[in-house]
């Protein structure tokens, strides 16, 4: 919001307001506070003073509450994703889809760790120079995680649509190579955007920042569309295909993950794309904090989805080790009576990619 009613929003002004949304500061560079302050415009303060401080106190309480909730859910999600990383990295054989899940858990873990520090610093108002660095890591981790979900959906769709090609002609180490490229591209895109928009070491360049934002927008739109197209194609193949394809646990895991991401993960990306255009509107800061909290919920929900789907057996919840639950959640063959694996499950688990 402008400091005065007559203040215009040129490129520089827009940039400073845009930055203030991320740094928990007002447009003058100071932290939001409930200390003694007066409105920046000339008006009869005796009339508006009480309403001004009441509104300001309400905003600060809401602000701190959202940050505290985000930090809390981030701590829980960090533990869950750390468990998935430990199991997939040290206790289970790696195969095509487990590599994607491992990298998705890594991106979520990085995001949640950084978000915990970021939210606590906003609440406790630590005045340090690490906010730009934290913001860069947050967006980098979000982009990386955003890449993994379309990759999982696309590869699953390929395995259903062209099973012979997938099992016979698919290059080895495809999953690891794709994940490495996604990490590298996400880092490069984030560094370019951060450098041009003044988040890193360079000065703010309005036109270069707009150019990088346009590239990021196009990239995110592609990532938003791919999971839905892949899931729709896979669902069509399962329902309308000439050969009946059984629904496995991994189908359910993918479907639930994409569904949760749609409601909890997409909003923060959409709002981030719209921020430069809606930054002048009142209340946009709290919208951004809410969608940030929702994405933290999404990152926290992924391990819960894996373990919950793995624990359901014959329509009943069963208590088993976390390793077994995670293996069941990624089981890509129909479950047989007595819990015996299908003939292709063992070969899939031994496929190192």
From Swiss-Prot:
<feature type="topological domain" description="Cytoplasmic">
    <location>
        <begin position="311"/>
        <end position="353"/>
    </location>
</feature>
<feature type="topological domain" description="Cytoplasmic">
    <location>
        <begin position="153"/>
        <end position="180"/>
    </location>
</feature>
<keyword id="KW-0297">G-protein coupled receptor</keyword>
<feature type="transmembrane region" description="Helical; Name=6">
    <location>
        <begin position="254"/>
        <end position="274"/>
    </location>
</feature>
<keyword id="KW-0807">Transducer</keyword>
<dbReference type="InterPro" id="IPR026234">
    <property type="entry name" value="MRGPCRFAMILY"/>
</dbReference>
<keyword id="KW-0472">Membrane</keyword>
<protein>
    <recommendedName>
        <fullName>Mas-related G-protein coupled receptor member B5</fullName>
    </recommendedName>
</protein>
<feature type="glycosylation site" description="N-linked (GlcNAc...) asparagine">
    <location>
        <position position="44"/>
    </location>
</feature>
<feature type="topological domain" description="Cytoplasmic">
    <location>
        <begin position="91"/>
        <end position="96"/>
    </location>
</feature>
<keyword id="KW-0812">Transmembrane</keyword>
<feature type="transmembrane region" description="Helical; Name=2">
    <location>
        <begin position="97"/>
        <end position="117"/>
    </location>
</feature>
<comment type="function">
    <text>Orphan receptor. Probably involved in the function of nociceptive neurons. May regulate nociceptor function and/or development, including the sensation or modulation of pain.</text>
</comment>
<dbReference type="InterPro" id="IPR017452">
    <property type="entry name" value="GPCR_Rhodpsn_7TM"/>
</dbReference>
<feature type="topological domain" description="Extracellular">
    <location>
        <begin position="1"/>
        <end position="67"/>
    </location>
</feature>
<comment type="similarity">
    <text>Belongs to the G-protein coupled receptor 1 family. Mas subfamily.</text>
</comment>
<keyword id="KW-0675">Receptor</keyword>
<feature type="glycosylation site" description="N-linked (GlcNAc...) asparagine">
    <location>
        <position position="26"/>
    </location>
</feature>
<dbReference type="GO" id="GO:0004930">
    <property type="term" value="F:G protein-coupled receptor activity"/>
</dbReference>
<keyword id="KW-0325">Glycoprotein</keyword>
<feature type="topological domain" description="Cytoplasmic">
    <location>
        <begin position="235"/>
        <end position="253"/>
    </location>
</feature>
<feature type="topological domain" description="Extracellular">
    <location>
        <begin position="118"/>
        <end position="131"/>
    </location>
</feature>
<dbReference type="Pfam" id="PF00001">
    <property type="entry name" value="7tm_1"/>
</dbReference>
<feature type="transmembrane region" description="Helical; Name=5">
    <location>
        <begin position="214"/>
        <end position="234"/>
    </location>
</feature>
<feature type="transmembrane region" description="Helical; Name=3">
    <location>
        <begin position="132"/>
        <end position="152"/>
    </location>
</feature>
<feature type="transmembrane region" description="Helical; Name=1">
    <location>
        <begin position="68"/>
        <end position="90"/>
    </location>
</feature>
<feature type="region of interest" description="Disordered">
    <location>
        <begin position="333"/>
        <end position="353"/>
    </location>
</feature>
<dbReference type="GO" id="GO:0007186">
    <property type="term" value="P:G protein-coupled receptor signaling pathway"/>
</dbReference>
<feature type="transmembrane region" description="Helical; Name=4">
    <location>
        <begin position="181"/>
        <end position="201"/>
    </location>
</feature>
<keyword id="KW-1133">Transmembrane helix</keyword>
<feature type="topological domain" description="Extracellular">
    <location>
        <begin position="275"/>
        <end position="289"/>
    </location>
</feature>
<dbReference type="InterPro" id="IPR000276">
    <property type="entry name" value="GPCR_Rhodpsn"/>
</dbReference>
<feature type="topological domain" description="Extracellular">
    <location>
        <begin position="202"/>
        <end position="213"/>
    </location>
</feature>
<feature type="transmembrane region" description="Helical; Name=7">
    <location>
        <begin position="290"/>
        <end position="310"/>
    </location>
</feature>
<dbReference type="GO" id="GO:0005886">
    <property type="term" value="C:plasma membrane"/>
</dbReference>
């Amino acid at each position: 919001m402008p400091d005065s009613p007559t203040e215009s929003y040129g490129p520089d002004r827009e940039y400073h307001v845009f930055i203030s949304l991320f740094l928990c500061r007002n447009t003058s560079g100071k932290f939001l506070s409930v200390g003694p302050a007066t409105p920046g415009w000339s008006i009869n303060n005796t009339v508006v003073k009480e309403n001004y401080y009441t509104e300001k106190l309400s905003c600060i309480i809401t602000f701190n509450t959202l940050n505290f909730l985000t930090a809390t859910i981030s701590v829980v999600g960090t533990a869950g994703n750390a468990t998935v990383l430990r199991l997939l990295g040290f206790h289970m054989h790696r195969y095509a889809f487990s590599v994607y899940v491992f990298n998705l858990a890594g991106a979520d873990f990085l995001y949640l760790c950084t978000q915990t520090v970021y939210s606590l610093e906003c609440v406790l108002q630590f005045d340090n120079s690490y906010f730009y660095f934290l913001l860069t890591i947050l967006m980098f981790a979000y982009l990386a995680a955003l890449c993994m979900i379309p990759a999982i959906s696309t590869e699953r769709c390929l395995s259903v649509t062209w099973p012979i090609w997938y099992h016979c002609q698919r290059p080895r180490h495809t999953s690891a190579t794709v994940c490495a490229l996604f990490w590298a591209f996400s880092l490069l895109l984030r560094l370019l955007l951060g450098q041009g928009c003044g988040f890193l070491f360079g000065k703010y360049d309005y036109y270069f920042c707009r150019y990088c934002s346009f590239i990021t927008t196009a990239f995110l739109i592609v990532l938003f569309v791919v999971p839905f197209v892949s899931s729709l194609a896979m669902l069509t193949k399962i329902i309308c295909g000439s050969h009946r394809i059984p629904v496995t646990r991994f189908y359910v895991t993918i479907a639930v993950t994409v569904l949760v991401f749609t409601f909890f993960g997409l909003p923060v990306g959409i709002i981030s794309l719209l921020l430069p255009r809606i930054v002048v509107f009142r209340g946009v800061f709290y919208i951004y904090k809410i969608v940030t909290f929702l994405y933290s919920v999404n990152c926290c929900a992924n391990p819960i989805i894996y373990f919950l789907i793995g624990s359901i057996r014959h329509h009943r919840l069963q208590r088993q080790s976390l390793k077994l639950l995670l293996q069941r959640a990624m089981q890509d063959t129909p479950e047989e009576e007595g819990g015996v694996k299908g003939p292709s499950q063992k070969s899939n688990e031994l496929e190192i990619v």
